[in-house]
């Protein structure tokens, strides 16, 4: 919170539940370009999706309202990104983990497909990943969105096969506007490099959440340490 402000029970809070992939090759992380024209690179991943029934349930229980801080369109209309009164916040988060009708951590292939498979960056039919934990921000006032917000991001680590490792190394050797590889220093500095006169941020702030050295700071999940294998279904194939 800012300036000693107190968040009241009826204060409106913006909340977002997301998942992010740590995809590491050597000492560098694979990042993809943000699709909302920020020009910045970020981890593969995005906001969890819920079903229409789930949204109705949330309206009935917690009186949630749509989050309009990011334009609601075809790609974002079912995002688990909402606003609600602070009085419901704890129960809302608890419900997300236990009862929510949504994408689950045992199959996080949707964003992987949209950001890597559909764009032909990689051509894989299966992925394996390990659950690392959850990053949770403090409840703070967002200067960007002018609202109190709390952001949750489940972090998973890709466990590539030998063939997939080869593919990733080949990607790292080639340049593309769709993706980039960045080490921890670049990510922590958000891509700013004064020595080379790169003074504009090119990496999104939330990218730091996937760094290997930050894993010990993540909150524990019931699934923490579990590994999942998910078959990939190409959305371009009917």
Task: Give residue ranges: language-model regions.
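N-terminal leader/linker segments that precede catalytic domains of diphosphate-processing enzymes
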Residues: 1-238
């Amino acid at each position: 919170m800012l300036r000693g402000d107190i968040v009241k029970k009826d204060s409106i809070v913006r909340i977002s539940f997301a998942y992010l992939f740590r995809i590491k090759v050597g000492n560098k992380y694979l990042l993809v370009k943000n699709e909302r024209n920020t020009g910045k690179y970020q981890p593969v991943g995005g906001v969890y999706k819920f079903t229409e029934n789930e949204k109705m349930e949330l309206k009935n229980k917690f009186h949630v309202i749509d989050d309009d801080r990011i334009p609601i369109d075809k790609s974002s209309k079912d995002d688990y990104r909402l606003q609600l009164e602070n009085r419901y916040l704890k129960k809302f988060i608890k419900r997300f983990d236990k009862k929510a009708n949504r994408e689950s951590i045992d199959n996080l292939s949707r964003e992987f497909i949209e950001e890597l498979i559909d764009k032909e960056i990689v051509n894989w039919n299966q992925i394996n990943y390990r659950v690392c934990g959850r990053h949770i921000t403090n409840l703070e006032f967002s200067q960007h969105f002018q609202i109190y917000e709390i952001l949750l991001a489940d972090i998973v680590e890709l466990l590539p096969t030998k063939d997939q490792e080869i593919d990733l190394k080949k990607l790292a050797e080639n340049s593309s506007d769709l993706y980039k590889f960045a080490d921890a220093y670049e990510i922590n500095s958000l891509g700013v490099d004064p020595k080379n006169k790169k003074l504009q941020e090119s990496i999104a702030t939330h990218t730091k959440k996937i760094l290997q050295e930050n894993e010990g700071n993540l909150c524990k999940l019931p699934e923490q340490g579990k590994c999942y294998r998910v078959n990939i279904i190409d959305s371009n194939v009917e």
